[in-house]
């Protein structure tokens, strides 16, 4: 059988990639598993964890496996970093915790970006791969379950910290210590990134198999239930504080659109404090009838 030149070149290249390659700069063969880099990272084992060329049911199955395996590794790292966060909060090491929280946020945000690679797979291709996945679902992910468990521990460590400092989340946002407010915001960053990842997964499901009461995931549940999971918070008290702040918000003391604000900083008041003494800032007069609206 005659093959096109293009096919021959591709086949030859594919075979070359499956064998050790000579690096002219190092003057060594890479891929034999003998070099320090390969030994330390266990690359022979790592690169053999995916189905082989003749085992794949579709070309995109390699991408599917690589992305999911990478997600598990990142979730493992995020979980272990979160355990360190628990230790840091318990010893009041807030500077160290702040730096580590930034790392966790970047890891979790990266999870969402990685899922975008899977969006390049068309639904008909996924339906072929799906036949070989058994009843597997994201709920069975070790990394997902590890991170949820670690986050629960972090939430408890946060509560212990607030108890030691005699603070509440609501009190922190009403003029509490700046270091704790910063911590609250960074914890919320983690939570928001996590929910963003769940949303990215939801969109991936929607794009590949559809979201509807009639569409069942491999675990037998309707894909429609995924929508509710996206907004389940890791740190509920931080979100509840927003609701409480808004519930106690007062319009009085603001500025009418277009009115002069000169001199008002000296008499500025909290949006949640009792009304200002009459005359403290003349520009505040008559604002209760100002037009309402949020941006």
Feature annotation, model-predicted:
Residues 1-295:
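Surface-exposed peri-terminal alpha-helical interaction modules
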């Amino acid at each position: 059988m005659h093959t096109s030149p293009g096919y021959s070149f591709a086949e030859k290249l594919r075979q070359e990639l499956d064998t050790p390659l000579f690096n002219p700069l190092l003057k060594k063969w890479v891929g034999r598993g003998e070099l320090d880099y390969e030994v330390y990272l266990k690359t022979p084992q790592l690169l053999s964890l995916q189905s082989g060329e003749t085992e794949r049911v579709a070309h995109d199955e390699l991408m599917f496996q690589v992305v999911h395996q990478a997600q598990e590794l990142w979730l493992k790292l995020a979980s272990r970093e979160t355990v360190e966060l628990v230790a840091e909060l318990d010893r009041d090491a807030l500077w160290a915790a702040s730096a580590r929280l930034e790392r966790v946020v970047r890891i979790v945000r990266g999870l969402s970006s990685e899922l975008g690679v899977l969006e390049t797979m068309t639904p008909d291709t996924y339906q072929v791969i799906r036949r070989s996945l058994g009843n597997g679902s994201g709920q069975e992910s070790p990394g997902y379950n590890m991170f949820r468990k670690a986050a629960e521990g972090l939430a408890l460590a946060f509560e212990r910290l607030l108890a030691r400092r005699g603070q509440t989340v609501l009190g922190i946002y009403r003029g509490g210590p700046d270091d704790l407010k910063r911590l609250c915001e960074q914890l919320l960053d983690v939570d928001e990134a996590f929910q963003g990842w769940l949303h990215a997964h939801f969109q991936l499901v929607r794009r590949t198999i559809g979201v509807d009461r009639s569409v069942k995931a491999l675990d037998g549940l309707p894909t429609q239930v995924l929508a509710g999971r996206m907004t389940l918070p890791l740190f509920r008290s931080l979100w509840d504080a927003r609701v409480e702040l808004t519930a106690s918000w007062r319009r009085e003391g603001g500025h009418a659109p277009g009115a002069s604000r000169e001199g008002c900083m000296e008499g500025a008041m909290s949006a949640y404090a009792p009304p200002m003494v009459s005359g403290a800032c003349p520009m505040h007069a008559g604002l209760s009838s100002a037009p309402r609206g949020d941006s």
